[in-house]
Amino acid sequence: MIRHMIPKRICSIDFALIGPKEIRSLSTSKVITADTYDDDGFPIPMGLMDMHLGVIEPGLRCKTCSRKLDECPGHFGHIDFAMPVIHSGYSKVIKDVLSSTCSGCSRLLLPQERIDHYTSLLEKIHESEAGTTVTMQEHIRRAIREAVKAKTCPHCTEAQIKLTLDKPTTFREEGRKLTPKEVRSRLEKIPAGDLRTLGFNPETTRPEYMVLTVLPVPPVSVRPSITLESGERSEDDLTHKLVDVLRINQRLRENRDAGAPQLIVEDLWELLQYHVTTYFDNQTAGIPTARHRSGRPLKTIIQRLKGKEGRFRSNLSGKRVNFSARTVITPDPYLSINQVGVPEMAARELTVPVRTNIHNLQFMKWLMKENFDPSDPERYIPGINYMIRPD
């Protein structure tokens, strides 16, 4: 019966990188000012606490959904970068893509018949139910290893220069540093057919998305400010980091538009790259840790997710719920193979909610009558901890 009610059945899920157009379409406000509140204590429009991003003050209504604090989930905004910056989480992927494509024509450094061979292999694995992500990745890695060995491009015969990655986000060709703008330009020119061989689905994901031109700004509910006893506001670590990003981004735009010397523009560009990198991960190897004035390291996005105290292990896997306990399983030679031993204290304390009906009424009455007697702990009888009457 239920099977006929379901119009469609999900058979697979594709994960994709979010592109700049989609970030802007999901955004409810463009953030351009680093200031948060005005003199009267109200959020500044187009600032990091703009009321279009949600509200955290009781009584105020969100300007996007018109809901109050406890009903509004929050909404994303966005920051437009003056110059592109590299997402440090994808540096190795960018290196693989650049190393296996031509620096001149941006074609994959494999003859066309080899490209067709790998493409057909990946398509067969994708269509086959027996195919797995692991086998696809093996073929993709094999194609990349084969392409990296090429000394000249088989399509335009241009000689290839070895690319190196200075962690976390600096790419060099024979000592010359590639700017994020050059990296993005080369990634944009890679044809869709070659991208499939590299494991990309060009209909949903392009490699240039790994070089950011737009940064999503998380809702206010994700980074709420707190009011101290003195009456002053203390902003969240993510808000502090976004303030740094906005200020440097504004200075970079002003200097670039004013025709400042290239050295000054490059220094500000590197500083923007640093702030964006530490915004994602404040423990990135090879760069200094961003800190408060007190010296405490900022807790940015990756630090909120990973590790024992992170969102997954602490708040999702290890959350506290009713009718459950965690205890050591007791070994016992008298237990059946399909049984586990549980300490008596946990067994008596934990309750299983049972709805009384005509089929179990007599059994429930017996449980109430023969309930556990603390004066006779040797006589174990399952009991009832409490009863909820319908009236």
Which residues does each predicted region cover?
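Conserved core architecture of multi-subunit DNA-directed RNA polymerases
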Residues: 1-391
